[in-house]
Regions:
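Periplasmic/cell-envelope proteins involved in peptidoglycan metabolism and beta-lactam response
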Residues: 1-391, 415, 490-497, 616-617, ...
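Extracytoplasmic
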Residues: 76-79, 86, 93-97, 176, ...
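Soluble non-cytosolic domains of exported or imported proteins
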Residues: 78, 125-133, 183-187, 247-251, ...
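Beta-lactam-recognizing serine transpeptidase/beta-lactamase-like catalytic domain environment
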Residues: 92, 98, 273-287, 332-421, ...
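Sec-exported extracytoplasmic/periplasmic mature domains
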Residues: 139-148, 198, 244, 262, ...
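Acidic/histidine-enriched alpha-helical segments
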Residues: 150-169, 320-333, 382, 443-447, ...
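Ligand-recognition elements built from short beta-strands and adjacent flexible loops
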Residues: 578, 618, 632, 662-831
Length: 831
């Protein structure tokens, strides 16, 4: 074949290049390349845009997400500050406790597994033997108290059975990763459980058919938490308050000083693994917690105990329906030494009201309108009976009311008409304004008309012409109505306001009521003024009464009451100190001196006036009783108004240091409603114990060498017996510790009636037996006289010191180990 010429070759080449298929292929190649370039550029743009969004625009957010995944941020719980009484005794503290929990889904030793060959599904079944063994061992430790005394646990008790079943049921939940086995467990029990779990898992690391051991493990862990402890239970509960389940102050000082007590939590930031667990990291960042500060109170546990004890006795003896309250306060500084509202609650278990349930139920049903416990129809209207009376709800849940009542601090949350106690304030108004002096006389004819109202004194008695001191002792309503008229509505209101009755006292406690019930100056008409002058028109709180009376006797200064004396850090260093805060001067010193005189005249030596029952031999005491009708409350079943019996005392009367106040809300004593009989003795009893303790100045008479004849107290009510002994300078003790005996009559006493005993001797009174109880005489030889006296007193014995009181006891009149009646006089000879 002849080859084409070179010329023809060029033409052939041109023909080939012009092939359309080749041209299309070339275009595709160019397009593909361009598309690839565009795609790469676009992808790069998207990546760059994404990187821009991630790194720059939203960089902070994504870095935060990364940190959250890579870092573990743990809270370091601050320790809550403690609360102490004035002498450093702990009233509230925080302890470390543990929550014991299990992960049943990871506890392979408690379950057996089987696989379905057809479906491949794995099922787990409980191993009863393993569950029983583990549940038993954990329950024994939980109930042992110390994690060691397992043999002491009664496995037949209901407590054991309940705890065992709870643990068994929790461990049986194979699909659950978290089951609480127990809360608030102490460290000893927690360690014991940990040791048991470790030993169990070690023993089951490998299967041992000969020993019947299956391979597996149990997963039981613990979480640290804190528990608020109140070592004295219901003691001063209304003041201390309590914390909720999360540790936040909910009531009382715990609430008002929450930010001070709580402290500031810290943090630890460290790396964590894929399972969320912390990795050991030397670069971990820790922000230490700042523990809470401590509160040191003006409250004194010894004074508080005395106030609570006698208040409880009075509530029981007089069948008080609506609780009672007591306050002991420094009149010059406002420091509260004791504050009680009874019945109250145990802050260790503040939600529990069972101890007071019967009392609270009766109280709620006595005030159905107040608590709204009537049965309602679906439309919200009340169900009524055939006579149109509202019907009580028989299935109502009153638990919320019960808790609210027992939590309330009655001294600051509830209003009442003060009654005749207010006459002290009216007297102060009159003297300071120049409308009266101690010698101002007014006539009481037994009845007095104001507008359309006619007023009487108690029992409609006519007191005749009397001066200010006599009128206060006689508690003459008509005298003080006339004095109020002399003062006039405008000036009366100004003083009422100045004494602090139109505002809160400012005490450092939460929930002080801001609801005030009084007549404004423009509405204080002649009838309202008349009723207000003797305390029956304006409602106030007990603490308002105490601060006003304090101002009336301390030179005229209204002070802010306080419970916290100082705030300290964890090392005891004082951060803040609370001193006296004088709000204003209300009356002059000269007017205050007059008020002190007429209040002392009210109590005198215990032989005159309604206040005499508060007298304690050896002390100058001023006081005033008040029996008021609660016009704003439902009436009693007999149609009479409910009463409040109260009494306030100050001492020493010439230069008062402390005030003692007691109020009984709606006493149902079968014999009387009078506060001079019901409340005054309670105040006297409190004074009889706290005055010597505080070192209150006496009346100046040296009675150390005197003897007193013991009166015959058999057949007397316990409260009357106390008054008789206080007046003579003898101490007293109810032999039964049960406050319910306080209203009974004395059936036996020792020392016996007629015995000559040293001043200050304790007379033991019995209300349930005709035979005195016996006690063993301690051996006090070789002891100092003071220590011997303390030992004998602790055994319930009285003491007479003979010889050199600065020496040691050489002899004792009753042999050591002898059994004698409580109250027996033991003479110790010292040398």
């Amino acid at each position: 074949m002849q080859e084409p010429s070179s010329k023809n070759k060029k033409g052939l080449y041109r023909l080939r290049r012009a092939d359309p298929h080749e041209r299309l292929s070339a275009r595709l190649r160019h397009f593909s390349f361009g598309a690839a370039v565009v795609f790469v550029v676009a992808a790069a743009g998207i990546v760059i845009h994404s990187l821009y969004n991630i790194q720059i625009k939203n960089g902070a957010t994504f870095r935060q997400y990364a940190a959250q995944q890579q870092l573990l941020d743990s809270t370091i719980q601050a320790t809550r500050g403690e609360i102490y009484d004035t002498s450093g005794i702990t009233l509230a503290s925080t302890s470390v406790v543990w929550t014991i929990w299990a992960d049943p889904s990871y506890s392979t030793a408690l379950f057996t597994s089987s696989k379905n060959d057809d479906t491949g599904e794995v099922t787990r079944a409980a191993d009863p033997a393993a569950l029983q063994e583990v549940s038993t061992q954990i329950t024994l430790r939980l109930l042992s108290g110390d994690g060691e005394s397992l043999d002491s646990v009664d496995t037949s008790s209901a407590a054991y059975q309940t705890q065992y079943q709870a643990v068994y049921d929790s461990l049986s939940k194979s699909d659950s990763a978290y089951q609480t086995l127990a809360a608030k467990v102490n460290n000893a029990i927690k360690l014991s459980i940990e040791q048991y779990v470790t030993a169990y898992n070690k023993a089951h690391k490998k299967a041992d058919a000969d020993k019947g051991i299956r391979k597996g493990r149990i997963s039981v862990s613990s979480t640290k938490s804190f528990q608020r402890d109140y070592p004295y239970g219901a003691f001063a509960a209304a003041v201390l308050g309590f914390c909720d389940a999360d540790g936040y102050g909910t009531y009382g000082l715990e609430k008002s000083y929450e930010s001070t007590l709580a402290g500031v939590n810290g943090r630890t930031i460290t790396l964590r693994n894929a399972y969320g667990n912390a990795i050991a990291d030397e670069n971990a960042t820790t922000y230490a917690a700042k523990d809470g500060s401590n509160l040191v109170l003006s409250l004194d546990v010894n004074i508080q105990e005395v106030a609570e004890r006698y208040l409880n006795e009075a509530i029981s003896a007089n069948n008080v329906e609506n609780r009672g309250a007591a306050i002991v306060m420094n009149v010059k500084t406002g420091a509260i030494l004791a504050m009680a509202s009874k019945p109250d609650f145990d802050p260790n278990n503040a939600l529990d009201y069972t101890a007071n349930e019967a009392y609270l139920n009766e109280l709620v049903h006595a005030e159905p309108e107040l608590y709204g416990i009537y049965l309602k129809n679906e439309d919200g209207s009340y169900v009524t009976d055939a006579n149109g009376n509202k019907v009580l709800d028989p299935e109502g849940d009153y638990s919320g009311y019960y808790r609210d009542i027992q939590w309330k601090n009655k001294t600051i949350t509830e209003l009442y008409y003060p009654g005749s106690v207010f006459k002290v304030i009216t007297a102060a108004m009159g003297v300071d304004s120049g409308k009266a002096t101690i010698n101002t006389t007014l006539n009481c004819s037994g009845a007095y008309g104001v507008a359309k109202e006619t007023y009487h004194c108690a029992g409609k008695k006519a007191h005749g012409v009397q001066n200010l001191a006599e009128a206060l002792r006689n508690s003459c309503n008509i005298y003080f109505i006339q004095l109020g008229q002399r003062i006039g509505s405008s000036l009366f209101y100004d003083y009422f306001d100045a004494f602090g009755f139109t505002e809160r006292t400012g005490v450092d406690l939460p929930s002080e009521t801001n609801f005030m019930q009084y007549y404004s100056k423009s509405r204080l008409g002649e009838v309202e003024l008349a009723s207000s002058a003797f305390g029956q028109a304006m409602a106030v709180t007990p603490l308002q009464v105490c601060t006003a009376i304090s101002a009336a006797v301390n030179g005229g200064y209204l002070v802010t009451p306080h419970v916290v004396d100082k705030i300290t850090d964890q090392n005891g260093n004082v951060i803040e100190e609370v001193g006296a805060n004088v709000r204003r001067q209300v009356i002059s010193e000269s007017a205050s001196k007059t008020i002190r005189q007429i209040m002392e005249y009210e109590v005198a030596d215990g032989t005159q006036g309604g206040g005499g029952r508060a007298y304690v031999a050896g002390y100058r005491i001023g006081g005033k009783s008040g029996t008021s009708e609660q016009l704003n409350m439902d009436r009693r079943s007999d149609g009479d108004y409910k009463k409040v019996a109260s009494f306030v005392a100050v001492l020493p009367a010439d230069d008062p240091e402390i005030l003692v106040y007691v109020m009984l809300d709606d006493p149902n004593n079968a014999k009387t409603d009078y506060s001079s009989i019901l409340a005054a003795p309670v105040v006297g009893n409190i004074i009889s114990e706290i005055a010597p303790y505080l070192g209150i100045a006496t009346d100046g008479t040296d009675r150390s060498g005197t003897t007193v004849k013991v009166p015959n107290l058999i057949g007397n009510e316990w409260s009357n017996a106390q008054v008789s002994l206080n007046i003579k300078g003898l101490k007293h003790q109810l032999a039964e510790s049960d406050a319910s005996q306080a209203g009974a009559v004395v059936t036996y006493q020792y020392p016996r009636a007629g015995a000559e005993v040293p001043y200050g001797t304790t007379v033991y009174l019995y209300t349930d037996t005709y035979e005195g109880r016996h006690t063993e005489v301690p051996d006090v030889t070789g002891k100092s006289a003071d220590f011997a006296r303390q030992m004998l007193a602790a055994a319930g014995l009285n003491c007479i010191v003979a010889g050199d009181a600065n020496g040691l006891v050489q002899e004792q009149s009753e042999a050591a180990g002898a059994s004698v009646q409580r109250g027996t006089l033991v003479t110790i000879t010292c040398g």
